[in-house]
């Protein structure tokens, strides 16, 4: 992560200590890190993938709106965090891994803003949603 800002490096360090699944994304949509709890849900270790560009991430993990979700839940929190520079939460998204396992998840994402208001990336925390 030598070419990343200090803030992004510190966020990666913090994510490594958290028990909640965390994905760290830069402004181009490249996943630059995900922690061990995220590996368990995503079904692949970060050591195996390394940083993942947006196209490859979409191939590895498919996110879609849950048809049962309310309209206020529409949208993907990471896209909102990066595009609108504000935090966002989705109560119901469907995640499908490359092994075809489908999980209903909740996602909270927020932008990382550096000095002078510069957008550095975004962080998503997510977890499997129990029940319907």
Where do the model's predicted regions map?
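PAS-family sensory domains
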Residues: 42-43, 50
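Terminal output helix/cap of sensory domains in signal transduction proteins
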Residues: 48-95
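Short, acidic, Ser/Thr-enriched surface-loop or helix-capping motifs
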Residues: 26, 65, 97, 114
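Sensory coupling linkers of modular signal transduction proteins
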Residues: 112-132
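PAS/PAC sensory module
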Residues: 89-94, 101-107, 123
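N-terminal capping loop/helix in small sensory signaling domains highlighted by a polar->aromatic N-x2-3-F motif
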Residues: 35-42
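Sensory modules in modular signal-transduction proteins
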Residues: 2-27
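Conserved hydrophobic beta-strand signature of PAS-family and PAS-like sensory domains
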Residues: 31-32
């Amino acid at each position: 992560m030598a070419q990343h800002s200090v803030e992004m490096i510190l966020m990666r360090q913090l994510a490594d200590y958290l028990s909640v699944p965390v994905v760290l994304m830069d402004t181009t949509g490249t996943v630059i890190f995900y922690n061990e709890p995220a590996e368990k849900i995503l079904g692949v270790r970060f050591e195996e993938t390394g940083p993942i560009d947006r196209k490859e991430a979409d191939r590895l993990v498919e996110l879609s709106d849950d048809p049962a979700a309310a309209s206020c839940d529409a949208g993907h929190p990471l896209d909102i965090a990066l595009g609108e520079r504000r935090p966002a939460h989705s109560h119901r998204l469907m995640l499908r891994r490359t092994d075809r396992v489908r999980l209903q998840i909740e996602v909270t994402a927020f932008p990382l803003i550096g000095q002078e208001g510069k957008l550095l990336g975004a962080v998503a925390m997510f977890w499997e949603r129990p029940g319907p």
